[in-house]
Amino acid sequence: MADLLFEIGAEEIPAGFVPGALRQLEDDLAKALADARLAHGEVRAVGTPRRLAVWARDVAPKQTDARTEAFGPPVAQAYDAEGKPTPAATGFARSQGVEVSALVRAQTPKGERVAVTKVEKGRKAEQVLPALLERLVAGLRFRKAMRSRFDEVTFARPVRWMVALLGGRPLKVRHGEVASGKVTYGHRFLAPKAIALKGTPDDYLAKLRRAHVLADPEERRAALLAELARAGKEAGGKVRDDPALVEQVLYLVEEPSAVVGEFERSNLELPPEVVISEMRNHQRYFAVVDGKGRLKNRFVAVSATRVKDPAVARHGYERVLRARLADARFFFEEDRKRKLHERIEDLGRRTFQAKLGSELDRAQRIGAVASGLARALGKDALVADLLEASRLAKVDLNTGMVGEFPELQGTMGAHYARLEGLKPEIADAIEDHYKPIGAAEEMPRSDLGALVAVADRLHSLVGIIGVGEKATGAADPFGLRRAAIGILRIVIARGYHLSLATAVEQTLDALAGVKLAAGRALVAEQVLDFLRGRVRAAWTERFDADLVEAVLAAGSDDVVDARRRLEALAEAKARPDFGSLAVAFKRVANIQEKAGGPGAAAVDPALLRDPAEQDLLAALEKVEQEVGARRAARDYPAVLRTVATLEPAVARFFDDVLVMAEDPALRANRLGLMRRVGALFSDLADFRKIQAEAPAQARAG
């Protein structure tokens, strides 16, 4: 057994490319070794902006032998009456590269056939690995790649060196004009000389560590966090928590070194989001806060190189930030010369989407949709504030500050609203209507912000789909998936029992002046299909797919209600008796469909001849009363527990009673009984879609 070590050294790879490339290397090498029949131990990838490396411990010295069996014609066609090979047999043997005498008889599902078993002897690992590693590096995919001017190969950035060692012995691997060797290189400035490697992962990490390179991202993360903690303390506070920035900086440096800087205290008069955005998004600096979380006029920058005089680096970082903050102060002061209401008409000169008109049109439609949603939810008292918040929600798009810092849309509008003395809830709604942002958990703080947020996303979703633009495959230029997910997350988080179909119709009403690419009914169905697709995708990440399908089939117009039904069904499925319950209710649902679907049905007790059907009706009448009250309260776990008590009676009914009796009156009465049983659960879930079977004991009984 020997360790395999493979490293690709390159010019600075963009930070966002490195984590994905390391995952690819790990997955692809493990799969390639398995496909090559080379046994191995741990496979792990590590890397920095200048190198991607992967190793496999304890690689077998040679491939395992491969046995393959090929089947030919039936024996009756392969041999004549005297047992001599026919042309069919000789032709098959020739195609397999063997003598006819090597053919054997084998039983197959298609009868007895001639066959040949071939054994491919395993080759030595050092013979297999060079081509395998060349395919590995050629198979790496990046969002953008560069082509060398000297050859046709591509990579994220030009490849400068490679290392390929098996048990310390070099393997001959090429990528374009670069051939592999057994030396790597340390930090570009602090240890640029070649470093000979023994080929083990531990040796690789240790030698690079001495050369100012922490190749293992987790080791580098620990060092980075320690540096940030030290620097925050030096700055008289602590570094503001920012996991996303930590992740980014982690792949910008090979050995982190933190430097504390300072900016003018007067810049703390700017909204803190402006200062933080300037530091983190434009300069990759970490903000420093005091014990109460208030911003200090300090920052921490992470350098890729430890310099002899930190003051030189600090001065450079401060100079760049000083200029950026001066620009921000200028935009802030200019913006404040005009009130938000004075900027509303400016939205008419800003196009939202060519076929959907201006941002002013958009703002007016958002107000109409938000008002309709409020009325549908019984929140009529919010309508006046919703119209005001909707008018102002997009106004900051025309400010200098948002023009310079697009990520602060909504945030700046809220700050300006507070400074102008507008209602705090209006200011909050201006900021909150963009939430949730991506996968962030932060949601709108109030109904006002939530309803404007839902209305904004509904307008985009219905409008964009309505004019014929759709999300296809990976392409979603208008962010329709993000809009749909945002709608669903807000509605569920706020517990809004809202009809999606009604909300879409209200949005189409607001878009009355827009020329749709298809009929109104078709557009509405396309939007609802799109929303259902997002519901399905989101819920199948957490719940069994069959349960999701069962719940959606029973209705998804009210997603809050559907989510509660799904959670109750998942809880029920975890119980040991669920299999029997599901099987029984599947049979009920199938018969119910034959009887004309769910609904009230007359059952004549006088026609119930069999004790099993009489007992079922008695149990049913008791359960119907209990279920009615619990369904009204949307207590679906209790509904399912109550309905489950019917399972023994239903099972006995199916065992003892012929539903499709020859007597039409008996048959209709029994079908009516099934319809009443089905009505208890048909609006909760379609049990026919649930994958479950009765326990073996129940089936045997």
Curated annotation (Swiss-Prot):
GO biological process: arginyl-tRNA aminoacylation; glycyl-tRNA aminoacylation
Top class in the EC scheme: ligase
Places the protein is found: Cytoplasm
EC number, UniProt record: 6.1.1.14
GO cellular component: cytosol
GO molecular function, one term: ATP binding
InterPro entries: DALR_anticod-bd (IPR008909), Gly-tRNA-synth_bsu (IPR015944), Gly-tRNA-synth_heterodimer (IPR006194)
Catalytic activity: tRNA(Gly) + glycine + ATP = glycyl-tRNA(Gly) + AMP + diphosphate
Main subcellular localisation: cytoplasm
Keywords per UniProt: Aminoacyl-tRNA synthetase, ATP-binding, Cytoplasm, Ligase, Nucleotide-binding, Protein biosynthesis
NCBIfam families cross-referenced by the UniProt entry: glyS
Family matches, as PANTHER family: GLYCINE--TRNA LIGASE, CHLOROPLASTIC_MITOCHONDRIAL 2 (PTHR30075:SF2), GLYCYL-TRNA SYNTHETASE (PTHR30075)
Subunit note: Tetramer of two alpha and two beta subunits.
UniProt record similarity statement: Belongs to the class-II aminoacyl-tRNA synthetase family.
Protein name: Glycine--tRNA ligase beta subunit
